[in-house]
Amino acid sequence: MIIHPNFDPVAIHLGPLAVRWYGLMYLVGFIAAIVVGRIRLKLPYVAAQGWTAKDIDDMMFYGVLGTVLGGRLGYVLFYKADFYFSHPLDVFKVWEGGMSFHGGFLGVTLAMMLFAWQRKRHWLQVTDFVAPMVPTGLAAGRLGNFINGELWGRVTDPTAPWAMLFPGAMRDDAAWLPKHPALVEKWHLADVFMQYQMLPRHPSQLYEIALEGIALFFVLFLFARKPRPMGAISALFLIGYGLARFTVEFAREPDDFLGLLALGLSMGQWLSLPMIVAGVAMMVWAYRRRAANANAAA
């Protein structure tokens, strides 16, 4: 078994100021997105659409606002609505954590629609340009989760080569044992807990880096190298992220205040299903629209 390094959550100490890893990873993610965007400017069809480096910089401003505001509101509404409705001022305590990708996604989508309206572009043209830039940011964010030792995976077989012990999960591990006697006996987890005071878990943050970050980036980047029907790149992002997140959630520990919901699925899975359906519908619409336009022009 591998023991999580239990990194110091503060990356840089500057006198009384502390730069935390999670915030630093957000910065790295946005910088990586800018780099990917500038690489895309070199594609002939992208240049023909009139995109510029200034457009990317402006989109990042909108993207940051959409990510932070949407991510926070999404967490409040999707995950802990009852608590925050009872403690409304706690909504503003972002330093205590609590961000939702799906909320951030909606926030960024609205921000890009506003950007498109201001630049007099179709909003799908904007999201098609932005979509390949997003996975690098997702990977950076999940790396921040891993460094912080948070959002760990479900308990797994201690003999598995990927099994990892997370010091931050000690309390959850102790509470897990009496609820799963069959697995405790099958995997001899009582002995493991006696020795380490922790249980082996999936490092699901690394799975998310691999699927939602690296794999999704290459799929989108390669797909977007050639001109596609308007909306197709955005659709592929919806499908790709939805499938990746839905899959990884089987190895990720559900939020303790929600647990598993209907059909044994987590909140993350239920929020990903509409993304997949919308992505498939948008992909079909995009290619049918291009075919209809081609027939009309013939």
From Swiss-Prot:
It is found in: Cell inner membrane. Pfam families: LGT (PF01790). It is a multi-pass membrane protein. A 1,2-diacyl-sn-glycero-3-phospho-(1'-sn-glycerol) binds at residue 142. InterPro entries: Lgt. Signal peptide: none annotated. One of its GO terms (molecular function) is phosphatidylglycerol-prolipoprotein diacylglyceryl transferase activity. It is an enzyme of class 2 (transferase). GO terms for cellular component: plasma membrane. Its EC number is 2.5.1.145. The chain crosses the membrane at residues 17-37, 59-79, 97-117, 230-250, 257-277. One of its GO terms (biological process) is lipoprotein biosynthetic process. Pathway: Protein modification; lipoprotein biosynthesis (diacylglyceryl transfer). Keywords: Cell inner membrane, Cell membrane, Membrane, Transferase, Transmembrane, Transmembrane helix. PANTHER family: PHOSPHATIDYLGLYCEROL--PROLIPOPROTEIN DIACYLGLYCERYL TRANSFERASE, PROLIPOPROTEIN DIACYLGLYCERYL TRANSFERASE. Catalyzes the transfer of the diacylglyceryl group from phosphatidylglycerol to the sulfhydryl group of the N-terminal cysteine of a prolipoprotein, the first step in the formation of mature lipoproteins. Belongs to the Lgt family. This is Phosphatidylglycerol--prolipoprotein diacylglyceryl transferase. It comes from Burkholderia cenocepacia (strain ATCC BAA-245 / DSM 16553 / LMG 16656 / NCTC 13227 / J2315 / CF5610).
